[in-house]
Amino acid sequence: MEQIKEQLTDIKSMNMDELTEFIISLGEKKFRAKQIYEWIHVKHVDSFDEMTNISKKFIQVLKDNAILISLKKEEVQVSKLDGTRKYLFALDDGNVIESVLMKYKHGNSVCISSQVGCRMGCRFCASTLDGLVRGLRPSEMIDQIYQIGKDIGERISNVVVM
């Protein structure tokens, strides 16, 4: 299954121009790209089936040619001290990453992972145990923000990349 996924186009990682070009290459009109972009980056849907203003026929074309990366929330730990939330997300390839939400008076800040593992070798950090495995796709980084925002039902105002 992983080999099949690698052949599909990761549309959450695309900017608007790239998405427009891709949608046109699939035989659809240009305006569809804007609709799909809004479903992904404004409404934060996790599957093509949630895109209710896209025809079922074109949804199937998308499923045949693209992948919509959506992280799976495995665990959330909440600090009793200050309410900080640590998230563990599973990636499609079986790896896991961590993200952290910190709530402040001025807004919600998240620290997102940019890679699986780390080569720094810090003794206190579990991320370094297996070394650096790989960098994350843009979609995997973006979806950390989207999933945390959906989890708390609030806007994320600041992002720190780890």
Question: For each predicted feature, which ranges?
Answer:
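Flexible, acidic/Gly-rich N-terminal and inter-domain linker regions that tether
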Residues: M1-N108
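Conserved Radical SAM active-site core
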Residues: I97-S114, R119-M162
